[in-house]
């Protein structure tokens, strides 16, 4: 494995640091789930409080972030009228709070006893936070127990890097089935789909011949197996997904709400489609309970695949615009690039960036463009961050041929033998020290 650091000096005095990492085989690259970080709830609340809300306080209301501790003792309804039969206690809790609580003057106002009991139990275990913008609305934001620190996972690994997009801002939480910290977008390893493709975005795929390519993929392209039943969109089932649809219509037959590789809920009622998944409607009756595992077929020849951001290079040619689909989940307006709340300019908007791709020999290459500190940035002292156009130039100069963006911004980091050679862009509001963001999913070369 080879790693090099480059510093680019611009005429206006700004600088940009870049790390390029190369290794031999895609088979060495695996997906990694960090151990849960106990303080993840506080970190996400701080991200809302320090970065998201100050950027546009007029579009945020009162946001209630909460987690369920493992030993949580409050009984939660598994069957809800509005959201169907749910598999997850976190989803059930979100439904209770959504139906029964609002926030005024940073304090809860309860509409029923179930919501009050749940809120007080979460308070006793220090598992609920309120972050407020200027609007009078209330948004319930469940936080999974998945996110952890990449620096604390697999400390002996040769390489670690963040990877997938995950539900993070409140507008990503489009339904009670969407939880902060849930990864989404295709992840496939040795033919097994870990997370399905969504939104028909571009994916980097490496087949068993070690040939890399980039192509658009959606969940409708795959065959879906649940409890021995095989479903294909347009053949014996209908799939409803965003951004084309906000709701699945409901009816006499049951709908399956799916996130990742699980049936999250089963419902006969009109159902809000999750941003992190989709809704499947079998044309024939099938007894499939909530919690059933989901298997995806159609990518068995793929050694490694990932679907995150827009392509950067295709067949050695720079991507000059946005080829993947992104949208503002709040109004379903097309936007050029994530985050879904703040549209970004392809040529001018700079941030920390991570790119993964293959060189002309098909070997993996990783590139990190260090981002500007979100608090306390001094031009010429720290990196300014890269636009997507600049990222394409950097990747081309590094000899990459097929390349996609991974999750960037405050999540972006590479660790070699558990050492970070560049700086992450999130900063502690008091000390200005680097502040690592919890993430649910990463990549590792052991």
Residue ranges and their predicted role:
Residues 1-446:
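Gly/Ser/Thr/Pro-rich low-complexity, intrinsically disordered segments
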């Amino acid at each position: 494995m080879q790693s090099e650091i480059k510093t680019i000096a611009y005429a206006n005095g700004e600088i940009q640091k870049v790390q390029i990492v190369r290794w031999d085989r895609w088979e060495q690259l695996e997906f990694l789930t960090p151990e849960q970080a106990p303080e993840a709830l506080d970190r996400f609340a701080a991200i809302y409080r320090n970065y998201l809300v100050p950027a546009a306080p007029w579009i945020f209301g009162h946001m209630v972030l909460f987690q369920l501790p493992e030993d949580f003792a409050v009984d939660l309804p598994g069957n809800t009228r509005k959201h169907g039969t749910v598999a997850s206690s976190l989803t059930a809790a979100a439904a209770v709070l959504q139906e029964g609580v609002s926030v005024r003057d940073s304090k809860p106002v309860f509409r029923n006893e179930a919501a009050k009991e749940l809120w007080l139990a979460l308070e006793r275990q220090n598992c609920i936070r309120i972050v407020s913008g200027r609007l009078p609305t209330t948004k319930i934001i469940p936080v999974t127990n998945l996110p952890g620190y990449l620096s604390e996972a697999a400390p002996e690994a040769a390489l670690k890097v963040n990877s997938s997009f995950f539900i993070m801002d409140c507008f990503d939480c489009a339904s009670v089935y969407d939880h902060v910290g849930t990864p989404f977008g295709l992840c496939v390893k040795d033919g097994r789909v870990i997370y399905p493709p969504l939104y028909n975005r571009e994916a980097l795929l490496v087949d068993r011949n070690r040939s890399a390519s980039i192509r658009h993929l959606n969940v409708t392209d795959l065959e879906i197996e649940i409890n021995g039943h095989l479903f294909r969109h347009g053949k014996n089932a209908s799939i409803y997904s965003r951004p084309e649809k906000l709701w699945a219509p409901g009816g006499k037959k049951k709908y399956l709400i799916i996130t990742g590789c699980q049936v999250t809920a089963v419902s006969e009622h009109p159902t809000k489609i999750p941003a992190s998944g989709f809704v499947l409607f079998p044309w024939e009756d099938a007894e499939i309970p909530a919690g059933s595992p989901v298997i995806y077929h159609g990518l068995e020849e793929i050694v490694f695949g990932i679907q995150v951001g827009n392509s950067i290079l295709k067949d050695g040619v720079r991507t000059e615009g946005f080829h993947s689909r992104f949208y503002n989940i709040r109004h379903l307006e097309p936007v050029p690039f994530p985050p879904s709340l703040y549209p970004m300019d392809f040529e001018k908007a700079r941030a920390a960036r991570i790119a993964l791709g293959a060189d002309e020999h098909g070997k993996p290459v990783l590139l990190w463009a260090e981002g500007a500190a979100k608090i306390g940035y001094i031009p010429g002292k720290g990196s300014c961050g890269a636009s997507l156009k600049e990222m394409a130039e950097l990747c081309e100069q590094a000899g990459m041929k097929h390349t996609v963006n991974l999750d960037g911004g405050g999540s972006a980091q590479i660790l070699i033998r558990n050492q970070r050679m560049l700086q992450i862009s999130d900063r502690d509001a008091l000390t200005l020290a680097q502040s690592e963001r919890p993430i649910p999913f990463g990549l590792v070369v052991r």
